[in-house]
Amino acid sequence: MKRIIAFLICAAVLISTAAVCSFALSDEKIDGEVARTTETVREGVTCTHISLGSKSKFKLQEMWIVEFDPRDPLFDLQVTCGGKYTTKLATVENTVRNFKEANKDKGLVPVVAINGDIWTTSYAHARIEGSGTEYGGFSDPVVTHEMTLPRGLDIYNGEIVSSPHTLNETPYERQLHAFGITADGRTVLGTPSLKIYLNDLSIDGFEQVKLSGLNRLPAQNTIMIYSDKVGEDTAALDDAYEIVIDCDYDYVIKDGATIKGKVTAICKKGDENPKLQQNRLIVTARGSKNIQKVKNIGIGDDVEVSFEISGSKKDGDIWSQVTNCVGGHTILVKNGKAVANNDSDVIPATAIGNTADGHVMFLVCDGRRKDYSVGLKISDMPELCKKLGFENCFLVDGGGSSTLLKTTGEDTYEIVNVPSDKFDDGTYGRPRTVVNSIILSFIDENLLATPEPEPTAPEETQPAPAATSDQSGNKKGCGSSLTESPALCVTFAVAFAAALPSLIKRKKNTSE
């Protein structure tokens, strides 16, 4: 018996040690590598700094790679914005601080964060009426005021806040990609789409209308729908035909959702733009053919809007289970193979992806400084990311937006890299405001709000308490195996050792 107990203790310790120390970042030297250091940000999270010399095929670079296992039940990975609305820009640090304050009762303590999706700007796609802006050969106005939107499919803690950039949001450069994660820590990289349909339940034989997108620019020849997460109004031009739908409950837009409401107003050309508010949706049609499709819908009608995420057949149904998702630029590695591109732009870069064993890695590389770090040529990134150990990886965003933030204490953070934007005195490192951030948090169960116990009959035997979960569905304090949580492995080993005397004593009083 003693031998069995000793064996189990050793096994538990070995498992916990393996879980703590097993990381997937390749230790193979990169061409021209002159220095590499790794620090543990907290148990289960490493940050590796790699320096490449000027003779490297990838040029002079300073880069950082963060690695962790998203399946660890004590970790939580979310995509979020810095304010109440998705149109609010904020620095990564301010977003992290706002996130921590909003989630303190859930025990979420941010550990590291990076910048997220690319977004629409007033000097490009979101051309403001009367500004005279021209971009990519297009000069037609799109909005009445500034409208900053993520350009990819973005999901914040289970709620879809934007569908991907559409063909009519001019100019349409390319199909955008997205990286998603499920509640149990599985990841997916692909090119998902969001199908949206509007149906009028008050009209017999009404032919449901396929909508162009969710929380996108109110572009010409589209039918967009806007949720209460996007801002105070749709910023649509005067020629838009808008249908206001009010719901009598707190709706959440997610895959498979059908949201029902009542039409409370219709705003035509010459009318004032309707206002968005909690539990309200607004359908905005532009172009005569599109307006005709929704013109029979009247005030007082009961309507419903359905949402469905779809990816490629190879992805299966995983996109329907994604709880957090960020859009972005270019796929660099897919299923272990570097994906070649001919983009010669050289930029500071932020990338995200997964390793073959399911870990997630962030990559942030500085740039735009010939004496420090020049930045990565996008066409070189597939080879580099493959060498670093990515199984799947894509370029989220770059330029002055590239930011890596990590915790340095209970409520202190530091920017690890040196962003390429300058302060007023000309020095580099000024953090840029971005449309959203990707935040890895540690779940501190000591900070969880304690619910009031429900009264129970004294004669009933109560079942063992189930493992709790946060809003994104990530389990806390349980896992499918010991290796999923280093903390649990250590706890198991310590508890087992503490119980040894009683186990041995009990053994003496029982038969073989």
Write out the residue ranges for each language-model feature.
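Zymogen propeptides
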Residues: 24-284
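Sec-dependent signal peptide cleavage junction
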Residues: 17-28, 475-481
